[in-house]
Every structure is written in structure tokens, then in C-alpha cells.
């Protein structure tokens, strides 16, 4: 018979000696449960049918959740400590090894802040929603709690539950409020993501029950189990498929252009700003941290897949005449740098991968919000039908220009710093042979060159292309309103701030990244050989040298 325990008392001294700092206040549990409870209250809010009261309520809940995460960072998080902080643990179903365990470290805290920040702005972006507003904002708030849980939980079964929790809101947001092909896009999304998540469940059960005795799925316990290399390789392959769908990795990416092609602006912001980052985070947390022996052999494959992402998606973006799909493929290209950074054995490269996730979350959210704002005015997404609207929408053109420059990694913007860190970190990573490093950085540079070409040509076609007489006479072509300027302004502040002073962000996860890389380098030095199963070509094999430290 299953047992239910109310609490499992902490031993602070034992926790600290194990690299865990208990929470003095349940900040993370509050940040997860507050938006979920708020979403359950939405149906009971009196409403006239226009959704005004619901909008303000949802904004208040989302903003409060953001302030809770900020308070957690300021009051309970120490960036200089590499272990788990803000830790909370409650025994739930001990016979199944299921524990309510949450906490934060350098891998998760920045993404928790990003999630609550982007969600708050997405709620503000959803202000024009008048069709079933209660259901819409209920799903938005439920998704907020689920996404924070993905980054905060410290139990692999809880991670799986949180991973699944955010799938249903996205499916409904696509299927109900999407475009003409919304049913197809939503069905494809749920089939890809729910189907691939089966690998997470299988890996969690295998890792938790391995070794016999009472199962335990807590990250700290799993990381110390010392799985065999063959077992790690099997789990790594399954998790790579599951997380590769969400990142996404080519060829597991085809759901993303369809989803973005049919989504509304607020859903765009959540997809690009948060959902894709879940895949990158999970690769770091599980594949690189818990399965270091397998990671040492799979890392070159991640690097190659990253280059494929960068070049393939950039070239495909050229061919897109649909504005949403063009930006969607641009997102896939930029996430390729995350794969290269995770596959590197240098603290600088891996830190660049983390910064690239944060940077792309901000930049991707801004671009997709502008796509939605532009569509509300032009009622078309086809670049061939746009053009000649720059004079009528000068502020909108300025916002598009700044955000596009951020996306193409202009110096002074966050994207430049993150991509430079990945390039430099991999180029100086002596864990790989010189030939391999030159080839990878050279191919990745091709993607960097392609990005400004398709982004700047896109701007020209939207605002300064051949004038569409019917579109130019459209009375809906009003310039950006204050709400839209405010949303983009809120996103540009951290984009420019990080670009000018990257340590604003990198200091928050520096020690955690260094600890992760040290663990992977130790595993590489132990088991990597020029004839490793996945890399029989000696030019691709790790050179067994010490990776450089993050300066």
C-alpha cells in the first residue's frame, strides 16, 4: 500500500556537506504553484465577455510569479556556490521513490527567471484576445507553472510530469486560437513531443530502479549511481531523441515551423522564448551531467548536429516566403550554437551555450511578437504581398530593425557575445583535434554569414519592397502602439545589457558550468579512445587534453 508523508525533515549540516543549501522560504514551490492555483481561479472571475477582468487578473498573477522568482534569486541564491540551492524536499510516495524535490543551481536559475519574465510579457501581448479569454489565460498561467517546474524540480519522475504538463496547454493554444491549419500543426506538435517523451519515462524508470532496493529518482542520487558505460549510452540515445525534438535538432524539427506558422503572438513568445530552452537545459542536466561517460562519446555527434542545424536551417530560411516560417527556421539555426557549446569540453563554450539559450529566448520572443503585430496590420504573412509600408509604420520599422540586428549577432547585443563564446570556446578546446575544430568553426561561420543576408533582405521586403497598392491603402496600417513598444523595450533592455556587460548573466551560472565541464572532462580522460564506437575516425576523436577554463 502506498504511503503519504507530509514532510521529510532536513539536516542542514548534512545537506551543506553534500553540496545542497536548504531553502529558508519555499520560493520555488511558490513560483510553481502560484500560477497554477491562479489558473484554477480564472473560471470564477466575473467577466462581461470582453475578457478585461481576466486579462488584468492573469497579468497580476504572471507579474507576481516573476517577482517571486526575482525574490528567490536575490534572497536565496548564491552565484558563487556550484551546488543545489533553495532546496525543498517532501516525501510524497516513498514506495515509488517519488519525492517533491525542487531546487536551483546555475543551470536552472537563469532559465527560471527567463520563463517568468517571458510569460509576463506574453500575457501582456495577449491583450487583444477576445475569443474565449478565460480558457486562453487559464492555459497561459498553467503553462507558466509547468515550465518553471521543468527547470526547478530535482526528481526525474517529477521532471517527466512537468514536461508533460506543459504539452496540453500548448496543444490547446494552437488548436483553438491558431491559423487555418491549426489542427494539423497542433496534432503534429503533440505527436512529436508526447511520443518522444516516452524515452524520458523509460530512462527515468531504468535509472531509478537500477541497483535494486527502493527506487530513487532524485538528480543527486542518480548522478552518484555510477552507471555502466553501455547503460549510459542506451539512456543517452533515448534522451537525445526526446530532448532533440524539443530543442529542436534536425531532422526532428519539422513540427516547429508548422507550430510557429499557425500560432498567435503570445504562443510564439512562449514557444521561442521558453519551450525550445527546455531541450537545451535537459541535455545539460541529464545527458551531460548524469551520463558523463556516454557524453564523452556522443559529444562529437552533438557538435556535428549543431553545425547541420546552423547551415541547413539558415539555407531553408532563405527559401521561405512565409514570415513566420522564416523566423522559425532562423530559431532552429541559432539553437545549433547551443548544441556546439554543449558538445564542447570547455567552460567557455558551454557557458556560451547557456548564454545563447537566454539570448535567443529574449530575441526570439521579440521577433515573433513583431511578426504577430505586423500580421494584425497587414493580414498577410507572405513576403510577396508586403512592401512599401515603412513610411506608414516608422516606429514598427525601427523595432524590427533593432531586433533583427540583435538576431544577426550585432556587437553590443547579447547574441554576439553568446555566439563569440561558443566559437572561441570550441576553437580553443584542445579536447578535439585541431582539424576538427577548424572544420566545425569554419562551417558554423557560414551560418553566421547567412543570417544577416536573409534577415536584412526580409526587412527590405517587408518595409521597402515593391509597394502593394492595396496594402498601402489599408487603414489598419497604424504605427506601433505604446503597449507594443513597451513589450519590445522590456526585451531589449536585457538584450543590450547582456551585450554590453555579459557578466550580468554569466556570473549567475559560472561555477555550475565549470563543475559540469570538470565532470565531463574527467569522464573523457577515463574512457575516450580514438576508436570509440561513435567516432572511429581519429580526426574526430577527443585528444584527451585538459579543456580551458572560463576566464
Curated annotation (Swiss-Prot):
It is found in: Cellular thylakoid membrane. It is a multi-pass membrane protein. Keywords: Membrane, NAD, NADP, Plastoquinone, Quinone, Thylakoid, Translocase, Transmembrane, Transmembrane helix. Its EC number is 7.1.1.-. Its main location: membrane. The keyword DNA damage does not apply. Belongs to the complex I subunit 4 family. This is NAD(P)H-quinone oxidoreductase chain 4.
Amino acid at each position: 500500500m502506498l504511503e503519504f508523508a507530509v514532510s521529510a525533515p532536513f539536516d542542514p549540516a548534512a545537506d551543506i556537506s553534500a553540496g545542497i543549501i536548504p531553502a529558508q522560504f519555499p520560493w520555488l514551490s511558490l513560483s510553481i504553484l502560484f500560477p497554477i492555483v491562479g489558473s484554477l481561479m480564472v473560471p470564477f472571475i466575473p467577466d462581461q465577455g470582453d475578457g478585461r477582468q481576466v486579462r488584468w487578473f492573469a497579468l497580476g498573477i504572471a507579474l507576481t510569479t516573476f517577482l517571486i522568482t526575482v525574490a528567490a534569486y536575490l534572497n536565496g541564491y548564491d552565484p558563487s556556490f556550484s551546488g543545489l540551492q533553495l532546496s525543498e524536499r517532501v516525501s510524497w510516495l516513498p514506495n515509488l521513490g517519488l519525492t517533491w524535490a525542487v531546487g536551483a543551481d546555475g543551470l536552472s536559475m537563469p532559465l527560471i527567471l527567463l520563463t517568468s519574465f517571458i510569460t509576463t510579457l506574453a500575457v501582456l501581448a495577449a491583450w487583444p484576445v477576445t475569443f474565449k479569454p478565460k480558457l486562453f489565460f487559464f492555459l497561459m498561467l498553467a503553462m507558466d507553472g509547468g515550465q518553471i517546474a521543468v527547470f526547478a524540480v530535482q526528481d526525474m519522475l517529477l521532471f517527466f510530469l512537468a514536461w508533460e504538463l506543459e504539452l496540453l496547454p500548448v496543444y490547446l493554444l494552437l488548436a483553438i486560437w491558431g491559423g487555418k491549419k491549426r489542427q494539423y500543426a497542433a496534432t503534429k506538435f503533440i505527436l512529436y513531443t508526447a511520443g518522444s517523451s516516452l524515452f524520458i519515462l523509460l530512462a527515468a524508470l531504468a535509472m531509478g530502479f537500477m541497483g535494486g532496493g527502493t527506487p530513487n529518482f532524485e538528480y543527486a542520487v542518480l548522478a552518484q549511481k555510477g552507471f555502466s558505460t553501455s547503460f549510459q549510452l542506451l539512456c543517452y540515445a533515448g534522451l537525445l531523441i526526446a530532448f532533440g525534438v524539443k530543442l529542436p535538432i534536425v531532422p526532428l524539427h519539422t513540427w516547429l515551423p508548422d507550430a510557429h506558422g499557425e500560432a498567435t503572438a503570445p504562443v510564439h513568445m512562449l514557444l521561442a522564448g521558453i519551450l525550445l530552452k527546455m531541450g537545451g537545459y535537459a541535455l545539460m542536466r541529464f545527458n551531460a551531467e548524469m551520463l558523463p561517460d556516454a557524453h564523452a562519446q556522443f559529444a562529437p555527434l552533438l557538435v556535428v548536429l549543431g553545425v547541420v542545424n546552423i547551415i541547413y536551417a539558415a539555407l531553408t530560411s532563405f527559401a521561405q516566403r512565409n514570415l513566420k516560417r522564416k523566423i522559425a527556421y532562423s530559431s532552429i539555426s541559432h539553437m545549433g550554437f547551443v548544441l556546439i557549446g554543449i558538445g564542447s569540453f570547455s567552460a567557455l563554450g558551454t557557458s556560451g551555450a547557456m548564454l545563447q539559450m537566454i539570448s535567443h529566448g529574449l530575441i526570439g520572443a521579440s521577433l515573433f511578437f513583431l511578426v504577430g503585430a505586423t500580421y494584425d496590420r497587414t493580414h498577410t504573412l507572405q513576403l510577396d504581398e508586403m512592401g512599401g509600408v515603412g513610411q506608414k509604420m516608422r516606429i514598427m520599422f525601427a523595432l524590427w530593425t533593432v531586433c533583427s540586428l540583435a538576431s544577426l549577432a550585432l556587437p553590443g547585443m547579447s547574441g554576439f557575445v553568446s555566439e563569440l563564446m561558443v566559437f572561441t570556446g570550441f576553437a580553443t578546446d584542445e579536447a578535439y583535434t585541431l582539424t576538427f575544430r577548424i572544420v566545425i568553426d569554419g562551417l558554423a561561420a557560414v551560418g553566421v554569414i547567412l543570417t544577416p543576408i536573409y534577415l536584412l533582405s526580409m526587412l527590405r521586403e517587408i518595409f521597402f519592397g515593391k509597394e502593394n497598392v492595396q496594402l498601402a491603402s489599408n487603414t489598419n496600417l497604424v504605427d506601433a502602439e505604446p503597449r507594443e513598444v513597451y513589450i519590445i523595450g522590456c526585451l531589449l533592455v536585457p538584450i543590450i545589457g547582456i551585450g554590453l556587460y555579459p557578466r550580468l548573466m554569466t556570473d549567475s551560472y559560472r561555477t555550475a558550468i565549470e563543475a559540469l565541464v570538470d565532470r565531463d572532462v574527467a569522464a573523457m580522460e577515463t574512457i575516450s579512445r580514438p576508436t570509440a564506437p561513435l567516432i572511429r575516425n581519429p580526426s574526430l576523436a577527443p585528444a584527451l587534453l585538459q579543456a580551458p577554463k572560463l576566464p
